[in-house]
């Protein structure tokens, strides 16, 4: 009887073990299906929030597999980026994501804009180099018509044989505008050209509130203008995040024209010894938003930055500096940078070598070169105000 009883107990234990193994296999299968679903977002009409939820579920189950070719996803979010690859038990390497964002709107019947996009994307992708575990995530903010233009261009410039992994994510401009408006409404009257003009739309303040719009799974992102030409591997620009001092939330280059010498004229008249609007290296010439490194995690955690978004603070600073601009987010960052420069990591001019010389011919020829000077090997050319970019 003792032998029979022991045999029955052993049989029951083996049955339970088999059930547990079946349950474990089912969980692994579910996780794999979730990951596959993420990589095929482009075939459906995913929303921003649903894609993020799907991503979280996939990451909870297993590491994402290597995609066979660049993906064209709609409103999706990618895994969090980090400075180094992380290894799970068993030696599995977790992908490291790098996020770039560009505005691509009103492009369908705009040949000059399409030409700029071609120059920017072709030079960016031709020089980009990433490790096997790294993924470049290209985010585009656009409406339906421009989205199709971008897809056609990317299919040409991103062949399946690209030397690195790349995902493309589209964000609907109308959806983001609705989310942005409550945050930036108060500041638009100080930094917009007027009703119905290009910068009067709240979407052009996206960088100001990006930390509230993007999911927390994206801790860092670089926002780029389309009138750029890249002369080096964009991967190197992400290393600038490591140079941020404590308290800094945004990396941005100086404005290379006396734009803000002009804008701050009244404050400068009332404060003749101020550095506001003066050229570098001693002065504060303001910022140019063509290339911006946004540490979204730091922006979310900064009490100072959060306070500066409040309408009362915006009005207080605008009144103090007699500030009325027309360049959207660039104006906002310039104004708060005069008051709180510790919020900003200043990029070298070679990361945003601006070429526009408009102010040289409009009253500031005597001081122009002090702002425009930039020494060193250019990494990114910026053909602002439709200035031609040098050929290779």
From Swiss-Prot:
Entries under Pfam families matching the protein: Glyco_transf_8
Record membrane topology: Single-pass type II membrane protein
Outcome of swapping residue 358 to A: Abolishes enzyme activity
Effect of residue 330 to A: Abolishes enzyme activity
Main localization (coarse): endoplasmic reticulum
The organism's place on the tree of life at top rank: Eukaryota
Quaternary structure annotation from Swiss-Prot or TrEMBL: Homodimer. Dimer formation may be essential for the retention in endoplasmic reticulum.
Family statement drawn from the similarity comment of this UniProt entry: Belongs to the glycosyltransferase 8 family.
Binding site for UDP-alpha-D-xylose: 103-105, 226, 289, 327, 330
Span list, region Interaction with target proteins: 262-265
Lineage: Eukaryota, Metazoa, Chordata, Craniata, Vertebrata
Key word RNA-binding present: no
Residues spanning the membrane: 20-42
Residues involved in Mn(2+) binding: 225, 227, 382
Positions on the Cytoplasmic side per record topology: 1-19
Free-text cofactor note: Has the highest in vitro activity with 20 mM Mn(2+), a concentration entirely out of the physiological range. Can also utilize Mg(2+), suggesting this may be the physiological cofactor.
CC cofactor: Mg(2+); Mn(2+)
Name the record gives this protein: Xyloside xylosyltransferase 1
Positions with a binding annotation for a glycoprotein: 330, 359, 384
Outcome (variant: residue 329 to A): Increases enzyme activity
Reactions mediated catalytically: 3-O-[alpha-D-xylosyl-(1->3)-beta-D-glucosyl]-L-seryl-[EGF-like domain protein] + UDP-alpha-D-xylose = 3-O-[alpha-D-xylosyl-(1->3)-alpha-D-xylosyl-(1->3)-beta-D-glucosyl]-L-seryl-[EGF-like domain protein] + UDP + H(+)
Subcellular location field: Endoplasmic reticulum membrane
A GO MF label: magnesium ion binding
EC number(s) per entry: 2.4.2.62
Record annotation: effect of changing residue 326 to A: Abolishes enzyme activity
Disulfide pairings: 349-374, 356-385
């Amino acid at each position: 009887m003792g032998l029979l009883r022991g045999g029955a107990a052993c049989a029951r234990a083996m049955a339970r073990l088999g059930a547990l193994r079946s349950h474990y296999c089912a969980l692994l299968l579910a996780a794999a299906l979730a990951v596959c679903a993420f990589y095929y977002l482009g075939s459906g009409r995913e929303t921003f929030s649903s894609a993020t939820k799907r991503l979280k579920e996939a990451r909870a189950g297993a590491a994402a597999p290597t995609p066979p070719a660049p993906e064209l996803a709609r409103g999706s979010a990618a895994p969090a980026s980090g400075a180094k690859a992380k290894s799970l038990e068993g030696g599995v390497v977790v992908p490291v994501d790098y996020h770039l964002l560009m505005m691509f709107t009103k492009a369908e019947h705009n040949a000059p804009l399409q030409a700029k996009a071609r120059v920017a994307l072709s030079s960016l992708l031709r020089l980009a180099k990433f490790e096997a575990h790294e993924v470049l995530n290209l985010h585009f903010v656009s409406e339906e018509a421009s989205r199709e233009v971008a897809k056609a261009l990317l299919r040409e410039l991103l062949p399946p044989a690209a030397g690195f992994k790349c995902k493309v994510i589209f964000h609907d401009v109308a959806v983001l505008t609705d989310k942005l408006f409550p945050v930036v409404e108060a500041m638009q009257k100080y930094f917009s050209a007027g009703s119905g003009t290009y910068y009067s739309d709240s979407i052009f303040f996206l960088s100001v509130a990006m930390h509230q719009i993007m999911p927390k799974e994206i801790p860092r992102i670089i926002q780029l203008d389309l009138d750029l030409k890249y002369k080096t591997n964009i991967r190197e620009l992400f290393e600038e995040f490591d140079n941020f001092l404590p308290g800094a939330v945004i990396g941005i280059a100086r404005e290379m024209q006396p734009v803000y010498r002009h804008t701050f004229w009244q404050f400068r008249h009332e404060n003749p010894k101020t550095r506001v609007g003066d050229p570098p290296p001693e002065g504060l010439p303001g910022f140019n938003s063509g290339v911006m490194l946004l540490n979204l995690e730091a922006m979310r955690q900064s009490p100072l930055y959060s306070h500066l978004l409040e309408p009362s603070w915006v009005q207080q600073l605008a009144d103090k500096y007699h500030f009325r601009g027309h360049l959207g987010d660039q104006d906002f960052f310039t104004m708060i940078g005069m008051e709180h420069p510790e919020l900003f990591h200043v990029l070298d001019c070679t990361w945003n070598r601006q070429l526009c010389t408009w102010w040289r011919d409009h009253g500031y020829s005597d001081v122009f070169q002090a702002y425009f000077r930039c020494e060193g090997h250019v990494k990114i050319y910026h053909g602002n105000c439709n200035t031609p970019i040098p050929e290779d």
